[in-house]
């Protein structure tokens, strides 16, 4: 009983120590208000983050494998088995990459050890996007290739101010076109001062000749949290009739970037190897082209630069090139096909490399391959033009 009384007395004493709101000084009241407000804001912030993560995770999906693509403005003629033909691959960088543009996900290191990182999450302005897309589509018009493979074509995207870039390329007179979607993101709030936003993009294939069919296939991608911000990587196989009764198989692709160590790109290359063999065994002429995001000339330091070789790049593994195929890239160019976007473009200072090109079957004769030097006026990539013939003997 004595113990119970003591406990009761202690509790009563503690209660007396607690002051009512009116008994607090103004300073003490302010401290309590600040603490309550801070706690409420912290709770609200945590709740907001949780809701946003649920939004990103629940909104995530991958497009199905083996999707038949729509063909716009199809042509009727087969491509001639005789003479020379051309194909251009061009990553147009969603119209954002003017020479002064840097991208927040790009990082690098200067030769003196100074780290570098890009700034922007969206294009500088809508006018800049329109200028760049008009410029890159103008290059296609100027060179008038028989076929074109275009990467990072945006539509209904925050990062490119909702400019429908498909129109600029599908509207080029004389071309049939297809689009394989490889980016469909939830709204990304990072970087906080210039959020990347909600975006849609794809790989376009253009043809002056009849398209028999075009199909989108899924590439493997990372399975960790990075999948929520990465592209839904894919490639498209487009079949074109040749007037000797055979078929040209054009494989349009865009492999993973920001893949430290190249683990995912290795898986993608292994899948591509299988696909190349299958298309060749069907009797097709085969040309795979696009942005491989891997060095295609076995020289990571070919071009003068004030920067070290970035950690994301590695050379394409020749073991992933099947029999009867070869990499075709411009080894003799004075400029790379891609610049680092961690710093503003300046020739001779910014890191450049050759990651855009082709893998070609041995029943196709390579006449020439050329990086078209645009001085990176409209994109962080230069277009690459392949001139070829069909072997008919």
Predicted segments with their positions:
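N-terminal, active-site-proximal structural segment of metallo-dependent hydrolase catalytic domains
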Residues: 4-171, 179-190, 194-200
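Metal-dependent phosphoester-hydrolase catalytic domains
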Residues: 20-41, 54-75, 277-287, 294-393
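Alpha-helical scaffolding within the catalytic cores
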Residues: 71-74, 134-136, 223-224, 232-237
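Beta-strand-turn-beta hairpins that frame and shape the catalytic cleft
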Residues: 77-87, 99, 198-215, 229-253, ...
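Active-site beta-strand/loop signature of hydrolases that rely on acidic residues for catalysis
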Residues: 86-92, 116-122, 132-162, 206, ...
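Short aromatic-enriched loop/helix-cap "lid" or pocket-rim segments at secondary-structure transitions
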Residues: 98-103, 162-163, 189-193, 218, ...
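Surface-exposed cleft-lining segments at the edges of enzyme active sites
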Residues: 119-125, 153-155, 219-227, 254-265
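Conserved S-adenosyl-L-methionine
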Residues: 177-185, 214-220, 368-372
């Amino acid at each position: 009983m004595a113990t119970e009384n003591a406990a009761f007395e202690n509790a009563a004493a503690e209660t007396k120590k607690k002051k009512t709101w009116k008994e607090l000084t103004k300073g003490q009241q302010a401290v309590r208000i600040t603490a309550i407000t801070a706690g409420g804001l912290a709770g609200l912030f945590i709740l907001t983050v949780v809701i946003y993560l649920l939004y990103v995770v629940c909104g995530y999906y991958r497009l199905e494998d083996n999707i038949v693509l729509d063909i716009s403005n199809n042509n009727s003629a087969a491509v001639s088995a005789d003479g020379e033909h051309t194909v251009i691959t061009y990553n147009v960088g969603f119209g954002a990459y003017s020479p002064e543009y840097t991208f927040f996900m790009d990082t690098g290191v200067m030769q003196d050890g100074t780290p570098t990182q890009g700034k922007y999450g969206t294009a500088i302005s809508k006018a800049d996007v329109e200028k760049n897309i008009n410029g890159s589509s103008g290059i296609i018009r100027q060179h008038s290739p028989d076929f074109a493979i275009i990467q990072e074509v945006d539509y209904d995207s925050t990062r490119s101010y909702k400019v429908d870039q498909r129109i600029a390329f599908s509207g080029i007179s004389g071309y049939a076109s297809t689009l394989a979607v490889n980016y469909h993101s939830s709204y990304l709030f990072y970087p906080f001062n210039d959020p990347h936003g909600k975006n849609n993009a794809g790989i376009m294939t253009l043809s002056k000749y009849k398209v028999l069919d075009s199909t989108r296939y899924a590439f493997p991608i990372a399975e960790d949290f990075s999948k929520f911000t990465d592209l839904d990587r894919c490639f498209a196989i487009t079949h074109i009739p040749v007037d000797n009764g055979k078929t040209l198989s054009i494989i349009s692709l865009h492999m993973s970037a920001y893949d430290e160590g190249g683990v995912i790109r290795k898986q993608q290359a292994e899948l591509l190897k299988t696909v190349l063999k299958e298309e060749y065994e069907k009797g097709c002429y085969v040309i795979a082209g696009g942005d491989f995001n891997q060095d295609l000339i076995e020289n990571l330091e070919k071009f003068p630069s004030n920067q070290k070789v970035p950690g994301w790049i590695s050379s394409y593994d020749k073991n992933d090139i099947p029999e009867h195929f070869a990499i075709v890239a411009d080894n003799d160019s004075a400029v790379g096909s891609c610049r680092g976007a961690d710093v503003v473009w300046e020739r001779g200072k910014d890191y450049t490399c050759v990651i855009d090109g082709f893998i070609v079957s041995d029943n196709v004769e390579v006449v020439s391959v050329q990086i078209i030097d645009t001085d990176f006026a409209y994109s962080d990539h230069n277009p690459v033009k392949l001139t070829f013939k069909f072997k008919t003997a």
